[in-house]
């Protein structure tokens, strides 16, 4: 095997493997180091992809139970086979990991299996499962090792009774009662999965609202929707302990306002309180500077404190910890290494919660705009007045567009919709090109589609929607 490269990427998650492919496409001799047996990182193996498989399957099951009969579809003797559902998820993941392997071969990227360390700025040492060390020379190094789940003090994740998101994607039977600690993206998606499949679900959230960082109008409405679906919430509550007794979990928590103590006994506890950068001792001991949050410090070109060593994705303190953000950074770094002008617009990175309905946003929230003392206008349009949503029985939610009062330029968009994750791309593109509400309002949208609600919300900025 050749041991000299132009670029060695450490980590084959969304940021790392995309960076490696783009480097190879730009003519750079590229290798990618990955410690796991499969490529794709957390996202592909135990995150974004398997969770979306279960979200889709569980929603199909819910519709068959609750909605098919109203449509004239009589699904008698409906049965749930969890093992088959999990097998379908695993097959999808395997196919996609094999797809990344194919792309590596297609682009002539050298896949190095093992753990990486950086003894010098031009050397990467790879240690395989048998502890054999091999040195590789390189002109540039890109660190994209992602993140891992965090827990709370005193709560030990065993992936049996007390689980991380990875464990909650692989239950071999449906828990009768599930407690989810954390009301963010991951917690709410997995709460939805297991509620649909039959679990009694309680979400405990430290704050007085769900999905921190989301527009308050959205989080308030979304909470109502999830309550209606049967998910229980304990907001403004602090978990003080979790114990396991005879394969059952006991969760103790206290209300932050009145100090009332409560206890719930359940079959499983999902700890979904966030993620932290995955920076191994082998990487941190290389002399690369970290910030106060233990993330790698980088400049505007994603270069660390050591020249020609770059970092992307969840290990740096730029933008949200999202797979598609890491992908964009991976492409930008590849272009920078190749002598081009790589760039990421952090003001136009969409975020999506893949529940049903979905929640999506891009740009600033109304709360952020108020804090920044920007004069603004708001346009809203409900899906109750959208024809496609009406015939599909998907009328929950609305689109909210916020624009600069003086320029009409779009500052932020938030929405709840059955297809919000797909719809938000239009708004990300609009913001990338500096569009105004009028630009969107004057753009012809196909009828009947959910996306017409975007056009109507843009019209509503000037209080003149057509259908509401």
In which residue ranges do the predicted regions lie?
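Flexible, glycine-rich terminal cap/loop adjacent to redox cofactors
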Residues: 8-19, 24-36, 49, 53-60, ...
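Beta1/beta-strand and adjacent pyrophosphate-binding region of the FAD-binding site
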Residues: 2-13, 174-184
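Glycine-rich dinucleotide-binding loop and its adjacent helix/turn
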Residues: 48, 143-200, 204, 232-233, ...
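Short glycine/serine/threonine-rich phosphate/pyrophosphate-binding segments
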Residues: 15-22, 162, 187-190, 196, ...
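FAD-site-proximal beta/loop scaffold in flavoenzymes
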Residues: 158-174, 263-338
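A Rossmann-like FAD-binding core segment of flavoenzymes
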Residues: 113, 117-128, 197-300, 371
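Glycine-rich flavin
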Residues: 2-5, 21-174, 202, 207-211, ...
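Short hydrophobic core segments
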Residues: 8-10, 116, 136-146, 180-181, ...
């Amino acid at each position: 095997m050749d041991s000299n490269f132009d670029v060695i990427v450490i980590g084959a998650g969304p940021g790392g493997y995309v960076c490696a492919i783009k480097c190879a496409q730009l003519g750079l001799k590229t290798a990618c180091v990955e410690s796991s047996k499969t490529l794709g990182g957390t996202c592909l193996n135990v995150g974004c992809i398997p969770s979306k498989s279960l979200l889709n399957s569980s929603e199909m099951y819910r519709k068959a139970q609750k909605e098919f009969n109203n449509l004239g579809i009589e699904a008698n003797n409906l049965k749930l086979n969890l093992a088959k559902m999990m097998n379908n998820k695993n097959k999808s993941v395997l196919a996609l990991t094999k797809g990344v392997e194919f792309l590596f071969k297609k682009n002539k990227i050298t896949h190095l299996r093992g753990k990486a360390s950086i003894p010098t700025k031009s050397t990467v040492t790879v240690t395989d499962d048998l502890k054999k060390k091999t040195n590789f020379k390189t002109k540039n190094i890109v660190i994209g090792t992602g993140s891992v789940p965090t827990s709370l003090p005193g709560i030990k994740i065993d992936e049996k009774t007390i689980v991380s998101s990875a464990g909650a994607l692989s239950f071999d039977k449906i828990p009768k009662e599930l407690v989810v600690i954390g009301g963010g993206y991951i917690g709410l998606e997995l709460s939805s999965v297991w509620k649909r499949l039959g679990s009694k679900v309680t979400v405990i959230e430290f704050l007085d609202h769900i999905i921190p960082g989301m527009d308050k109008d959205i989080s308030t409405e979304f909470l109502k929707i999830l309550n209606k679906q049967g998910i229980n919430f304990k907001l403004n509550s602090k978990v003080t302990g979790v114990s396991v007794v005879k394969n059952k979990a006991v969760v103790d928590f206290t209300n932050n306002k009145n100090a009332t103590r409560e206890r719930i006994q359940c079959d499983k506890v999902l700890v979904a309180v966030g993620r932290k950068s995955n920076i191994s001792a082998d990487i941190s001991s290389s002399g690369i500077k970290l910030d106060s949050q233990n993330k790698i410090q980088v400049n505007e070109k994603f270069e660390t404190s050591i020249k020609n060593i770059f970092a992307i994705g969840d290990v740096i303190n730029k933008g949200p910890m999202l797979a598609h953000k890491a992908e964009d950074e991976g492409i930008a770094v590849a272009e920078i290494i190749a002598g081009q002008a790589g760039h990421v617009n952090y003001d136009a990175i969409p975020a999506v919660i893949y529940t049903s309905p979905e929640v999506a946003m891009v740009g600033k929230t109304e709360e952020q705009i108020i804090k920044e003392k920007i004069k603004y206008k708001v346009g809203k349009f409900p899906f109750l007045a959208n024809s496609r949503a009406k015939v599909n029985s998907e009328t929950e939610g609305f689109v909210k567009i916020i624009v600069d009062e003086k320029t009409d330029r779009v500052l932020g968009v938030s929405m709840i919709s059955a297809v919000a994750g797909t719809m938000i791309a239009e708004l990300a593109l609009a913001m990338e090109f500096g569009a105004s509400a009028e630009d969107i309002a004057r753009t012809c949208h196909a009828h009947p589609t959910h996306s017409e609600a975007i056009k109507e919300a843009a019209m509503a900025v000037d209080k003149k929607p057509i259908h509401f």
